[in-house]
Amino acid sequence: MAKKTPGNNGKQKLFCSFCGKEQDAVKRLVAGPGVYICDECISLCNEIIAEDHEHSHEKSEVFSEVPSPADIKSILDQYVIGQDHAKKALSVAVYNHYKRVNLKEKKSDVEIEKSNILLIGPTGSGKTLLAQTLARIIKVPFAIVDATALTEAGYVGEDVENIILKLIQNADNDIKKAEVGIIYIDEVDKIARKSDSASITRDVSGEGVQQALLKIIEGTVANVPPQGGRKHPHQEYLQVDTKNILFILGGAFVDLPNIIKSRTGIKTIGFGSEEQRIQSENKDVLMEQVIPEDLIKFGLIPEFIGRLPIVATLQELNVDMLRQIFREPKNSVLKQYTRLLELENVKLTFHDEAIDKIAELAIKRESGARGLRAIVENIMLDLMFDIPSRKDIEEVIITAEVIANRVAPTLILKKESKIA
């Protein structure tokens, strides 16, 4: 309500409804229905609006400098060994996705569809690491969710909208940032329907989840419960537009090679270890020939596959690749442990033969790159417990015997004495 007070001449004096200044103290007072605003407050409002517009413009240009596909792959190469085909496919898809986001901000007439990605590869082949690294390169919020925890609405388990909540939380509750983030849905092969024909019974953690994910992956305004959990009618929701969220889905799809083999007729031959090698190579060749019909036969519904235009396959890791993974990436297991011991002024040395044994053990356990850390954690546990309490150790040497036969590592003491 505008402020009015009686003046000396009996006339009412008018005041600005916002700052309280009298009409005589300002250049101009603009009247509205029951309110007044002075020229100074109008100027201040203009400044605030201009500042908001500037910030909005800055947000729309966040991805104006998206790295080129070659630059994205070059950074991926620093963290992930091998998998060149998958890295190229991901680099192009991510580049195009965020260029598409810019295009929408600039209100282009051309509608470019989303480039959601399906990664197919064995456990420990680098699917999650690739997705995490992409989010770091583009500098966007990132969330990982397990598809096996999801169920369709009305059943025990997580609603699919909760995957958006994790992204919001990782974006420091900034919904605008979350709306251009990346979500990695792991173990998506576990939500395949139980057979490739429609079932008359409910498949609440399979086809039902695929159906529930369709709209979110394609792009919709999702109602997200702010505290997570199940939705109920009298609850307030966070509204999140998913049209610019990049979805990367990953899974091992263990039986998929057999489906492709039955379609293509490719056979594997060989004997002993040679047979294993040939089968592994043939499996990689088979996986590269995957087509949508194979995925439908596996148990993904056609509408779901249609929302995943980019399909990239990852190779099964061999001993040579695991050796490289152990040594070479920026955040390799070897470099991490070397740095941890450096902080204690201790040198860490792994013999080449020890690294060979670690790689062979990871292959035997079928745990891929993820298994490397588990093996080394087990070997290094006692050392990592003891070393911070000791100041006499100069170097720790890990030999093949340490890995193969669980003998104690060699410790070189600062007084040149050796304890084996």
Curated annotation (Swiss-Prot):
GO biological process entries: cell division; proteolysis involved in protein catabolic process
Keyword tags: ATP-binding, Chaperone, Metal-binding, Nucleotide-binding, Zinc
GO cellular component labels: HslUV protease complex
SMART domains: AAA, ClpB_D2-small, zf-C4_ClpX
Matches recorded under Gene3D superfamilies: 1.10.8.60, ClpX chaperone, C4-type zinc finger domain, P-loop containing nucleotide triphosphate hydrolases
Transmembrane segments: none
SUPFAM superfamilies in UniProt: Glucocorticoid receptor-like (DNA-binding domain) (SSF57716), P-loop containing nucleoside triphosphate hydrolases (SSF52540)
Residue sites binding ATP per the record: 122-129
Residue ranges of every copy of the ClpX-type ZB domain listed in the record: 4-57
PROSITE patterns: CLPX_ZB
Family indicated by similarity: Belongs to the ClpX chaperone family.
Organism of derivation: Leptospira interrogans serogroup Icterohaemorrhagiae serovar Lai (strain 56601)
Alphabetical list of Pfam families matching this protein: AAA_2 (PF07724), ClpB_D2-small (PF10431), zf-C4_ClpX (PF06689)
Functional description taken from the UniProt entry: ATP-dependent specificity component of the Clp protease. It directs the protease to specific substrates. Can perform chaperone functions in the absence of ClpP.
GO molecular function: ATP binding; ATP hydrolysis activity; ATP-dependent protein folding chaperone; protein dimerization activity; unfolded protein binding; zinc ion binding
Protein residues bound to Zn(2+): 16, 19, 38, 41
Classification via PANTHER family: ATP-DEPENDENT CLP PROTEASE ATP-BINDING SUBUNIT CLPX-LIKE, MITOCHONDRIAL, ATP-DEPENDENT CLP PROTEASE ATP-BINDING SUBUNIT CLPX-LIKE, MITOCHONDRIAL-RELATED
Identification of the protein by name: ATP-dependent Clp protease ATP-binding subunit ClpX
Coiled-coil parts of chain: none
Self-association state and partner proteins as the record states: Component of the ClpX-ClpP complex. Forms a hexameric ring that, in the presence of ATP, binds to fourteen ClpP subunits assembled into a disk-like structure with a central cavity, resembling the structure of eukaryotic proteasomes.
